[in-house]
């Protein structure tokens, strides 16, 4: 009986320790800065999160997660309806961010300045050399436009758009239509 009590107590302590160690952001299906998801077929914009903020989250949650919590190496600025994340090393422009409308997050964006913090398939997308490289990674777009200046590749069924302008690559995640 004494042995059983010790085992149960030890198990409870281990489970409590594991629960405290795993942060809430790890439960997201695809956290841009943490998960190495490579399967693009099941990827939807509703499953994407940026430092714990997902599409449809409240303004309060976005402010708490992005502004109030310190993110290493990231400078945060809030302008109008946007929360911009800038690289502290070279704060030349936003590398990622969210747009808030009607009290909810309705757009998450990342660009190639954010590639060093991105994991999984979108790191490869942000570092791609051409629109064809993006197509090899994500498959054929639903529709798009390509000219000498660059390309817009729209993956509406999955809820994101890739803007490819030479070395500048932007990914915008929005709610599915």
State where each predicted segment sits.
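Bacterial N-terminal signal peptides that target proteins for export
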Residues: 1-11
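A cross-family detector of function-defining hotspots
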Residues: 29-30, 57-104, 120, 124-177
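Hydrophobic h-region of N-terminal signal peptides that target proteins for export
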Residues: 13-18
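Second-shell loop/turn segments in exported
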Residues: 47-53, 117-125
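Glyoxalase I/VOC metalloenzyme domain signal
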Residues: 112-116, 174
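N-terminal export/targeting and maturation segments
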Residues: 29-62
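Boundary at the C-terminal end of the N-terminal hydrophobic targeting segment
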Residues: 20-27
């Amino acid at each position: 009986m004494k042995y059983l009590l010790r085992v149960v107590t030890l198990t409870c302590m281990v489970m409590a320790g594991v629960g405290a160690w795993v942060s809430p952001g790890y439960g997201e299906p695809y956290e841009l800065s943490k998960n190495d998801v490579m399967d693009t077929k099941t990827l939807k914009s509703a499953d994407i999160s940026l430092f714990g903020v997902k599409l449809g989250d409240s303004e309060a949650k976005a402010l708490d997660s992005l502004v109030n919590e310190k993110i290493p190496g990231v400078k945060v600025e809030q302008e109008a309806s946007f929360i911009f994340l800038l690289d502290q090393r070279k704060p030349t422009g936003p590398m990622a961010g969210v747009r808030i409308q009607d009290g909810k997050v309705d757009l998450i964006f990342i660009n190639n300045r954010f590639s060093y913090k991105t994991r999984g398939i979108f790191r490869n997308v942000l570092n791609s050399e051409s629109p064809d490289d993006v197509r090899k990674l994500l498959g054929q777009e639903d529709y798009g436009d390509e000219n000498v200046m660059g390309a817009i590749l729209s993956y509406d069924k999955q809820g994101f758009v890739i803007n490819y302008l030479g070395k500048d690559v932007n990914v915008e995640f929005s709610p599915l239509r």
